[in-house]
Amino acid sequence: GLWSTIKNVAAAAGKAAIKL
């Protein structure tokens, strides 16, 4: 659902932030 998508995007953004 929409919430799952939001969590997936947030997780991806978090991983990207860690790499930076």
Swiss-Prot record:
The modification Leucine amide is found at L20. InterPro entries: Dermaseptin_dom. It is found in: Secreted. GO terms for biological process: defense response to bacterium; innate immune response. Expressed by the skin glands. Its main location: secreted. It holds the Pfam family DD_K. GO terms for cellular component: extracellular region. It comes from the Eukaryota. Keywords: Amidation, Amphibian defense peptide, Antibiotic, Antimicrobial, Immunity, Innate immunity, Secreted. Antimicrobial peptide with moderate activity against both Gram-positive and Gram-negative bacteria, and important activity against Leishmania species (L.amazonensis and L.infantum). Acts on both Leishmania promastigote and amastigote forms. Shows activity against E.coli (MIC=17.8 uM), S.aureus (MIC=32.3 uM) and the phytopathogenic bacterium Xanthomonas axonopodis (MIC=2 uM). Shows low cytotoxicity against mammalian cells in models of peritoneal macrophages. Belongs to the frog skin active peptide (FSAP) family. Dermaseptin subfamily. This is Dermaseptin-N1. It comes from Pithecopus nordestinus (Northeastern Brazilian leaf frog).
